[in-house]
Amino acid sequence: MNMNVREILENITKEHASDIFVVAGRPLTYKVSGKMHTYQEERMKPDMCRDFVTAIYELADHRDISQFETTGDDDFSFAIVGVSRFRVSTYKQRGSYSAVIRIITFTLPQPSELMIPDAVME
């Protein structure tokens, strides 16, 4: 997998995904409307996950990765101008770097998109 992480985040965000999952042994996966999709079929190797997670820290204004490396987990957020905001949870799973990335859009959805009844909106 060619890993331009910024480009991957942009592409997945355009798919209206809510979450991205980075786990060794699985393809890069994202969720759209409750359904899981793979970004590419190639399974991510531990070194690919390490590179992906490290790139996320660099995109997050070069956040210090040492806490994650010491404790095995970390939570933070960052934004890519013109793309979206992201809330990230990094952790080690079976010794490999892993992450769950929640995509937080810049705009709020319409109540109808959330299926909120009209009676509640009145």
Question: Where is each model-derived feature located?
Answer:
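N-terminal "pre-motor" subdomain/linker immediately upstream of P-loop NTPase catalytic cores
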Residues: M1-E122
